[in-house]
Amino acid sequence: MSNKRIYELAKELNQPSKDVVEKAQQLGINVKNHMGTITTGDEKKLQQAFKKPQTNKKPAQQASQKPATNQPNEQKKQETKTKQQKNNRNYQDRGQGSGQVNQGKNQSTNQNRSNNGGGNNQNRQGATQSGNQNRQGSTQGGNQNRQGSNQGGNQNRNNNNNRGKFNNNNRNRFNKKGKKGKQQTSNKPAVPPRKFRELPEVLEYTEGMNVADIAKKIHREPAEIIKKLFMLGVMVNQNQALDKDTIELLATDYGMEPQEKIQVDIADIDKFFEPEELNPDTLVSRPPVVTIMGHVDHGKTTLLDTLRHSRVTSGEAGGITQHIGAYQIDIDGKPITFLDTPGHAAFTSMRARGASITDITILVVAADDGVMPQTVEAINHAKAAGVPIIVAVNKIDKPGANPQHVMQELSEYELIPEAWGGETIFVEISAKFGQNIDELLEMILLVAEVEDLKADPKQRAIGTVIEARLDKGKGPVTTLLVQQGTLNVGDPIVVGNTYGRVRVMVNDLGRREKSAGPATPVEITGLNDVPQAGDRFVVFEDEKTARAAGEERAKRALLEHRAITSRVTLDNLFESLKEGELKEVNVIIKADVQGSAEALAASLQKIDVEGVRVKIVHSAVGAINESDVTLAAASNAIIIGFNVRPTPQAKIQADNEEVDIRLHRIIYKAIEEIETAMKGMLDPEFEEKITGQMIVRETFKVSKVGTIAGAYVTEGYIRRDSGVRVIRDGIVIYEGQLASLKRFKDDVKEVKMGYECGAMIEKFNDIKVDDVIEGFIMEEIKTN
């Protein structure tokens, strides 16, 4: 015999498929729904199970709407009297439309059913018996006639039954009805009483917990705790914070020992950098981190370029490194990480930050220039950080190079060469031609071996931000130096006051990496904002904790900033009152990287001009946008863009609102311009200085553009931003500004003597061949 499906067996048993599935699962038969198949043996088990009396019945239907298929279930009810059972069957037949009802008794039966609350509200389990018993009672005489000879004893007995059934019917009257008006009894199990749970022996609490929090900890209802506190003389609600004394009083009354839980400040990431956090058993050797320092143009970037075999300098404006770069090179299987700090005085803070995360400092000194101001600053930073110094005497290939003079000058700063009995390593090199570079690398590895540098690669990564910027397509891009542990893609991370998850990790060669060990520089994306250069970063165990820590740090930083900017004391009260007469320059700084923005802001704030000071209204990374222009218009500020350009919309808005936007690629030019503007507030005196002359050799007329002069510079130089005079036959016929200055279709800032160029003059097109164009600038006469 083939297997049978559940719904087929349900039809045979006259049972719902759902009940058959439930019964099969109770018997251990593996079926899931009505389409499941069962064997012949399982079929017999189910048939046997459904032959037993059913204790749980379905909700009753109206007596007039009972289907014939439910008759077998009705016959299984417990019988009390044979006569009542016969009457039940007769009543069921009448409810099924059989028509076999005594016409003489119909009126009295309907009357009894109406008096007893109506058959429509009767429960299925008692509908047949109660209906027939009511018909046999003494309600209104109809049944008395039918039971004439038994009015005495049977009437009293049946009246008692009717009272019980009447009460049941009244209760059922208010039962909910189904879709077709059928009565439904609740099949939901009764709510079990709450299981009693013992009180804990110790109550761990934190100050500020409320009643609801304590109720969860001690497994009690909040109302019970509120009542107990009321009895102890403390009136609270369940959401009210409780102080330490109240919590301890409550715990003592319950017989528990109160124990205050020390809260860990998740926003404090500096604790992860403590030496005590390191496990001595898992420490291994790590690569050294080397910082290259020195005066501007002494060859730091050229040295690093030689080490990396790339042209870093060619991409730098003015030959000066604009932001910290981190690179790693491999020497005979031993990696070395290099940090290239800018050499200009404006980058003092960045250089100090570089020294704080480095292991070895290479001090680059030009053999022809000797010790310069930034050289001394670099020495002081390295000594303050306790970092060993290796002196690289550069440019020994140049005529006039005097390495001995450099050694003599540095000895005044306690950097005495080993050849003179000191401890400082000196290496004479030529970064341009790669002379003695191998010897310098050997010295670095030697010093690193002596320093015995260790790190734990197994812990969660910690480190420092080298640089950060806002990329148009990638969002915040951050260069990190891993100091301890291993940084992996996907790690939840907190960087300064920002947070996120490491989405993409790229090494210094532009290749994607999945992990980065100690002393490895990488560039990551995935942060919610641009951090500050020099911020520390920590990897957290989960993203939720990292987010909470980052948001808390950002909140604290904002509150601290507001407190600093709004704080007034008796010491500065007089100065604050005088600020009404104080002239100031409001400046908004936008730069390509955070380090440059910081350096420019620090330099501008150091400008000391009597009666005038610089106020940095806003400093950020990224292109100059409409929000910056709106802020500048509201605060009457000048926008300085460093290596960034304004968006087209921002440029249009700036023109409409007459906001001054100054764009620069060299940092000291920006400082110089602001300083000049500040001194202008003091009504300085200027004098004219002729920079050069050029002779017009050809003219080109371009429609909708104007006249372009093809000229040859005969004296000095002509700058794009200088003023010009057009001289014809010794007479000045026009004075104005250059509209453009080009060489070979490229815009240039200046053209020197002996070179040809193309020039356009603003609002002047009457240029003739052999005209002389004289360039001049207005120089300020320095005031003492």
Swiss-Prot record:
Organism: Enterococcus faecium
Protein known as: Translation initiation factor IF-2
Basic residues: compositionally biased ranges: 173-182
Biased composition (Low complexity): 106-172
Ranges where the tr-type G domain occurs: 285-454
Residue ranges with Polar residues bias: 56-69, 93-105
Region annotated G5, chain positions: 430-432
Coiled coil: none
Domain of life: Bacteria
Region (G2): 319-323
